[in-house]
Amino acid sequence: MNATARQEPADLNDPALRARAVTAARGDAPFDMLITGGRLLDTVTGLIRQADIGLVGALISSVHAPASRTDAVEIIDAAGSILTPGLIDTHMHIESSMVTPAEYASAVLPRGVTTIVWDPHEFGNVHGLDGVRWAIEAARSLPLRMILLAPSCVPSAPGLELAGADFDASMITEMLHSSAVGGVAEVMNMRGVIDGDPRMTDIVNAGLAAGKLVCGHARGLEGADLNAFMASGITSDHELTSGADLLAKLSAGLTIELRGSHDHLLQEFVEVLSGLGHLPPTVTLCTDDVFPDELQEGGGLDDVVRRLVRYGMKPEWAIRAATFNAAQRLKRSDLGLVATGRRADIVLFEDLTEFRARLVISGGRIVARNGSMQVAVQQIDTAPLVNSVKLPPLTENDFRIPAKGERVRVATIDRPRFTQWGEAETEVRDGFIVPPAGSAMISVAHRHGKTDGIPRIGFLTGWGEWRGAFCTTVSHDSHNLTVFGGNAGDMALAANAVISAGGGMAVAKDGRIEAMLPLPLSGLVTDASLKDTALAFAGIRKAMEKIVTWKPPYLVFKACFGATLACNVGPHQTDQGIADVVTGKVLENPVLAVW
């Protein structure tokens, strides 16, 4: 982890650069670039005013009265544009977009996103430290500023699941030694922190000792549990469940990473914040997870800003949360504000409703114009990410549970979110359990080569009637081979299609593959273009509608990718069985009684 990224923010304090900026600001030398005729949104006051901006290298040398200076090597006509700082995404996972970091950068920079805080824990869960090293190397030469975080919970629920790696505090410390790593990523093992588990305590303390961020995942925490979680040194949360939860977390003193991936809650969040009469300085914005078709169609953090404004948030509040507040959270005073002496990350938006970027400047360079990249984006070798699915072909019987007797009582997992334990009775036919009426099957097979790859099968209630099967290696957070279905035949067919592809997603119905998305890199991403990936993923979505009827907001396609997230409260299927983080126990086989 000795590799370092660009040495920011200290690069702005180069004496020669500062001297040039001072000289240009006095009017004794021309600017490198002069932006004229635009209206500047001040992210401190929220006011909009006419102003011209002079740049010297990566530095803003002058913010001055319109048309008072005309001397510059390059002049940008910003007439009709609103100027803001570059947008900052405070919590996200590139892997959720299923494309490489280079392709992701090419997608969001033209939309005005100049900085992301990337938790590469998907790569970490599959490849261990080598995956994080690859992410650092991939980010190094990209024009999109990527502040990486050290994945804190690999796996997310130790003892309840097996990932491709197991990070302890010494590994976190190694990652934190890299200047490219800005802190410890979302601490999802909430119970471990609250109960003083030595592993999690040491991981949090590693971040504190490094003087870097320690980020949280405080879903459902309140009262003594929330206090214990925060007392450890964790300072942020993006796992909000309601407007009341948002207000409670703000009052508690957490930095909020308001995420766009739960759109059904955004309206309520806007109403709560509007009721305060001001935007708290601890409200930032993030995307968390954006699927490829959503990224292609709507964008990244710009889409979150756009939706918040559509739901009634003041545009200046949304921009402030996405820029100034975010920069303060990251301890990056050079970002988030278009002001003299700060870094020249500037976006020229057409308006403050649709937020279409006409021009994007990052570090004093024009990186995108009218939706197109203006600088090269370097893709590094992806060979280290292949061959991550270590499983043989599976058979129909691998997706059946054998049992003696005539009837059985089985444990079930009830509801797609906020899961609960349930029970059901069903019959045994030809030596195998018949899935209980109204249930769907879920199977998780370890695919990282650390233990056997035998599928562990459970029964889901509240998931509707499945008329086929869906297999995915994108399955948070250990990303084992996960299959949902209504019959063993289609489940085996979908699973083998994904295994043959080296990872990805497949939908099967009536003995045929309806749709396929190969993800041969880590079983998570592809080196195909975003356009092609989005098209294939949209095909998966469409095929899914043939085999299951969704019922928003909880029974939705996205629920398939979080059904194995064992760090969340309640029962969840893993490669070890049905796991419960509260009790710390795993039920390897769902059969409770036979008669």
Swiss-Prot record:
GO terms for biological process: adenine catabolic process. Its EC number is 3.5.4.2. It catalyses: adenine + H2O + H(+) = hypoxanthine + NH4(+). Pfam families: Adenine_deam_C, Amidohydro_1. Its cofactor is Mn(2+). Keywords: Hydrolase, Manganese. Gene3D superfamilies: Metal-dependent hydrolases (3.20.20.140), Urease, subunit C, domain 1 (2.30.40.10). Coiled coil: none annotated. SUPFAM superfamilies: Composite domain of metallo-dependent hydrolases, Metallo-dependent hydrolases. One of its GO terms (molecular function) is adenine deaminase activity. InterPro entries: Adenine_deam, Adenine_deam_C, Amidohydro-rel, Metal-dep_hydrolase_composite, Metal_Hydrolase. Belongs to the metallo-dependent hydrolases superfamily. Adenine deaminase family. PANTHER family: ADENINE DEAMINASE, N-ACETYLGLUCOSAMINE-6-PHOSPHATE DEACETYLASE. This is Adenine deaminase 2. The lineage of its organism: Bacteria, Pseudomonadati, Pseudomonadota, Alphaproteobacteria, Hyphomicrobiales. The gene is ade2.
